Design a protein with these regions (language model features):
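N-terminal secretory signal peptides that target proteins for export/translocation
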Residues: 1-4
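Bacterial N-terminal signal peptides
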Residues: 7-17
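A broad, structure-centric signal for solvent-exposed, well-ordered loop/edge residues
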Residues: 8, 56-59, 89, 124, ...
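Residue-level signal for mature regions of secreted extracellular proteins and peptides
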Residues: 11-13, 127, 231
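Short linear sequence elements within intrinsically disordered, low-complexity coil regions
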Residues: 12-13, 44, 66, 271
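Extracytoplasmic thiol/disulfide redox context detector
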Residues: 18-171, 244-258, 285, 290-309
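Cysteine-centric redox/oxidoreductase cores and disulfide-bonded domains
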Residues: 21-28, 32-34, 65, 165-262, ...
């Protein structure tokens, strides 16, 4: 029994040495200040220092998790290395060379049921996180369609995901819901709606009141549905319900992969932030085609010139 008790006590002491420990208040305060300063965080962002656990990969260091919460569900944990003397903290990025980063990122984007343009069999997929009220999105949309769609043809598939910036664009979520109501019956109706809104955003903005702007969106939606012979009663019911579930799920997915502005494109996983030139888009598309073993379009000298504004 004595041997058993001793063995149990030894095992207990070993385990106690490995369990997580709360960061002492003074250490937690230092860590929080360093994180706030380095990432230039405003006071309303909540920084929480988690437990300290021994590192199994880095001798001489412990691991500490820091949670950064910007509100509205935008919360993420970051792992740091903390020296045993608590005087040094490191932020390392670990790369898994057995996985392709672009393929891994694309696998995190759910494209199920989304309307597409181009060929579904294309080896290059362009995912655009779009906001119908965003003026830069409108300019990007008019670069992608029809110019790049015509130029790349069946070499590329284009897919749109919802990422309305509701804090600054009050009718963007409503427009996204309306567009998805159209898509539920006919993907072509979705694209005609997207083409129209991005080309005629002022028509909605020109209405005098917020309610009138939403009514204008619904009117455009019903007209597009009529054009494509959609079931008017079903479309009207969908528009009236304004179910934001799918839109907000798309927004959360964007948050998870680093989207924080619009437009944001992923070309076979390569991220492009904001409005960029058509030359940069062509270069990225061509690179993705070459990586996929596909031919790039043959261009004339005139097609290489900057697009007119």
């Amino acid at each position: 029994m004595t041997i058993i008790r001793r063995s149990f006590l030894i095992l207990l002491l070993i385990c106690l040495g490995c369990v997580a420990q709360s960061a002492p208040p003074d250490v937690a305060r230092k860590i929080e200040r360093q994180v706030r300063s380095y990432y230039n965080m405003p006071p309303d962002v909540k920084v929480t220092v988690g437990s300290i656990v021994p590192s199994t990969e880095w001798p001489g260091y412990d691991m500490v998790a820091v949670n950064i919460d910007g509100g509205e569900g935008k919360s993420k944990d970051y792992q740091f290395l903390l020296s045993k003397d608590r005087n040094t903290m490191l932020r390392l990025t670990k790369f898994d060379l057995t996985k392709d980063p672009y393929t891994e990122l694309m696998s995190k984007i759910d494209l199920t049921g989304r309307p597409t343009r181009g060929a579904k069999s294309a080896k290059v997929v362009v995912v655009n996180f779009d906001d119908f009220e965003c003026p830069y999105c409108s300019r990007m949309h008019q670069t992608l369609f029809p110019e790049l769609l015509k130029e790349y043809g069946d070499r590329v598939e284009f897919v749109y995901k919802d990422y309305p910036l509701a804090e600054i664009h009050p009718w963007a979520i409503h427009a996204a819901v309306d567009a998805n109501c159209l898509a539920a019956q006919n993907p072509d109706a979705y694209w005609d709606f997207a083409d129209y809104i991005h080309a005629n955003k002022r028509e909605v903005d020109g209405e005098a009141t917020p309610g009138a702007r939403l009514q204008a969106l619904d009117k455009i939606t019903m007209l597009q549905g009529q054009k494509h012979n959609e079931d008017a009663a079903k479309l009207q019911a969908c528009v009236k319900a304004q179910d934001e579930t799918a839109v907000r799920a798309s927004m959360r997915q964007g948050d998870d992969i680093g989207v924080n502005a619009t437009p944001t494109l992923f070309i076979n996983g390569q991220k492009i932030d904001g409005l960029v030139s058509i030359q940069e888009l062509r270069a990225t598309l061509d690179s993705a085609l070459k990586d996929a073993g596909q031919p790039v379009p043959t261009r004339t000298a005139s097609s290489s010139l900057p697009a007119s504004k």
